[in-house]
Structure formats: C-alpha cells, structure tokens
Design a protein with these regions (language model features):
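Acidic/histidine-rich catalytic neighborhood of metal-dependent amide-processing enzymes
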Residues: 127-128, 134-213
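Short, solvent-exposed loop/turn segments at the edges of secondary structure
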Residues: 82, 95, 116, 158, ...
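A generic structural motif
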Residues: 47, 134, 169, 226-227
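Acidic/His- and Gly-rich active-site-bordering loop/insert found
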Residues: 24-131, 150-158
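Metal-dependent amide/peptide-bond hydrolase catalytic core
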Residues: 21-24, 62, 201-204, 208, ...
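A short aromatic-rich beta-strand->coil structural motif
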Residues: 42-44, 143, 227
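Bacterial N-terminal signal peptides
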Residues: 7-18
C-alpha cells in the first residue's frame, strides 16, 4: 500500500520541541523519520515468513543510540519471532504513565498481487509504497522518531511516557497486546495509531501552531490484503 509523503512530514515535524531547539532542521527530522520508515518496510513482519523481533530490535537500537538506558528499552515476548518493543521515557512521576501503542506485524503480501516489491521501500510521485506503508509502519516510524527527539532534548514530562510496538495485531493478540497486558499492565490509558493522523493528532506531539491540512488524502484501490 502507499502513504502520503506530505502527511508523514507534517506529523514528524509536530513535536512540542521545535526543530531549532533540537539542533535539527525540519528537513533533517523528516529524513531521519524516512530512514526509520524505510528500515521498517524492508523488514518482513508477516505471520508466515516474517520476523517481528528483527523490527523490534532495530527500533530498540535506534532508541538506545538516542540515549535511552538498557533498562528502559525492552524487547520481549513469548515467541522467538514475535517479540514486542517496550520503551520508557521517564518523567517526574506526578501522574500515571501514558502508553503510545502500535503494531509491527503486517498482513500477508504476495508478490503476484503487487506491481512493486512489497518489501522494498519505494517513494514515487509523492507517495511511499510498501507492505505496512498504510497499516501501520508509517505511525510506528513517527512514534519512534518522536521518542528519539524527546530523549535527545532532555524532555522531562510529568509522567512516564511508554512506547509499545507489538506483534500479532493482524492475526491475533496472544504474543502481542495480550502478553503485554499480563506482563506490563500499568499505563493509565492508551493512544491508538489514529492519534497520529493529521486530523487527530495528540496534543503531546502537536506543535504550538496549528498544523496545515494536507492538500489531499491518501487514496488507493486493492483487490485483497490492504495495508
């Protein structure tokens, strides 16, 4: 599937920390987010042949490189190929934690159903193409990029912020959200992936000025297996 380049750029630039304060230009932030997105697309995380753990470990590496200590970045789960990423940005503890949740697994992608390689990241005519570009590796990349920036700039919230990127959303939740609820049930609420679309962006990741609306919405046609 495909995702609008402009929509992703708007979201990646929407942190409460300005680009000037971060030492990165908006373009640098967008390019780093694009690199994260590309890395995720090119890791096959389908149920049949993929490995969600590889994607979780790749994102964990980026978070650790941004300054998160080992104890605050965990890759864990009950199955070797389907582990979850949980990262914590520690705050003052004045309020209960907030969980930002997404999933790393994707639906199956047969090469015969695609005009391009579904596991080769492609940018063309203002759109990104690849399995997971619409559901939901674009949101995963935005989340990881924002957590990276928050850590780099020493953002210290009044509560812990927790990032969870899970396995098995597409085919069942045993290895993903069900396991997390049993093993790490503490956040006060969850913010689903819809919170990171331009029309429904959470206030924590919104810039002080209102974000402009995209000129057009992503649109696509599919015979089967959307996402």
């Amino acid at each position: 599937m495909r995702h609008s380049v402009r929509a992703m750029a708007l979201l990646c630039g929407g942190l409460v920390i300005s680009s000037a304060a971060s030492g990165q230009s908006r373009e640098q932030v967008n390019q780093e987010a694009r690199a994260i997105f590309k890395e995720l697309i090119e890791i096959n995380t389908t149920d049949s042949a993929g490995n969600v753990t590889l994607a979780a470990e790749a994102m964990a590496k980026r978070l650790r490189e941004a300054g998160y200590p080992e104890k605050d970045v965990i890759v864990a789960g009950p199955q070797e190929r389907k582990k979850n990423l949980v990262a914590r940005l520690r705050g003052t503890g004045q309020k209960k934690p907030v969980l930002f949740i997404g999933h790393l697994d994707v639906v199956e992608a047969l090469r015969s159903d695609w005009t391009v390689d579904p596991f080769q990241f492609l940018e063309r005519d203002g759109y990104f193409y690849g399995r997971g570009a619409e559901d939901m590796k674009e949101s995963d990349a935005i989340l990881v990029m924002n957590f990276v920036r928050l850590k780099r700039e020493g953002f210290h919230p009044d509560r812990d912020l927790i990032l969870a990127l899970t396995a098995d959303e597409e085919g069942g939740s045993y290895n993903g959200i069900d396991w997390l609820l049993k093993a790490h049930r503490e956040p006060s609420c969850a913010l689903p992936n819809s919170s990171f679309r331009p029309e429904n962006q959470h206030k924590l990741f919104r810039s002080p000025a209102a974000l402009p609306e995209p000129a057009s919405r992503p649109a696509f046609r599919t015979r089967r297996r959307p996402g």
